[in-house]
Amino acid sequence: MNQIVLNIIIAFLWVLFQDEDHFKFSTFFSGYLIGLIVIYILHRFFSDDFYVRKIWVAIKFLGVYLYQLITSSISTINYILFKTKDMNPGLLSYETRLTSDWAITFLTILIIITPGSTVIRISQDSKKFFIHSIDVSEKEKDSLLRSIKHYEDLILEVSR
């Protein structure tokens, strides 16, 4: 977060040093790019990773989530319309590696938003999720647990 603020300050200073009569976005953008280069060169002195990497991970996370949301929505619609007799609803558990409260909450929200699954309970130590799924057959269960693990890996990558 400090790197972003520093980069914006560098961009504004760049605009001020250009001595133009009015604000130009192109000047601000060039100052932002210069700040990006400076921060990249000096980022080893910061305690955090280079912030553009985190932005890239967040964009990747959004893409993965949207893909999972669309595919699970189609799967749920398929079950409702064509496979109502084949449904096998039930509970399953998932052990998480997340430790912070915000990460656990975020993973819970992602599971709840995904069609066909919802978090029923989280254990007292916040390490185990109890999830209700529309289908707990072996194939669907493995698919759901893989997608939850993928969400968890992305949350861990963003939070580093």
UniProtKB/Swiss-Prot annotation:
> Any idea where this protein resides?
Cell membrane
Bilayer topology term:
Multi-pass membrane protein
CC terms in the record's Gene Ontology section: plasma membrane
Which GO molecular function, any one, fits this protein according to its record? antiporter activity
Note the superkingdom of the native organism.
Bacteria
Q: Which residues cross the membrane?
A: 22-42, 55-75, 100-120
Cysteines joined through disulfide linkages: none
Could you list this entry's UniProt keywords, alphabetically sorted: Antiport, Cell membrane, Ion transport, Membrane, Transmembrane, Transmembrane helix, Transport
Q: Pfam family of this protein, just one?
A: MNHE
Family of the protein in this entry: Belongs to the CPA3 antiporters (TC 2.A.63) subunit E family.
Instruction: Describe the subunit structure.
Output: May form a heterooligomeric complex that consists of seven subunits: mnhA2, mnhB2, mnhC2, mnhD2, mnhE2, mnhF2 and mnhG2.
Its recorded name reads Putative antiporter subunit mnhE2
Provide the species name.
Staphylococcus aureus (strain JH9)
Query: Which gene does this sequence derive from?
Result: mnhE2
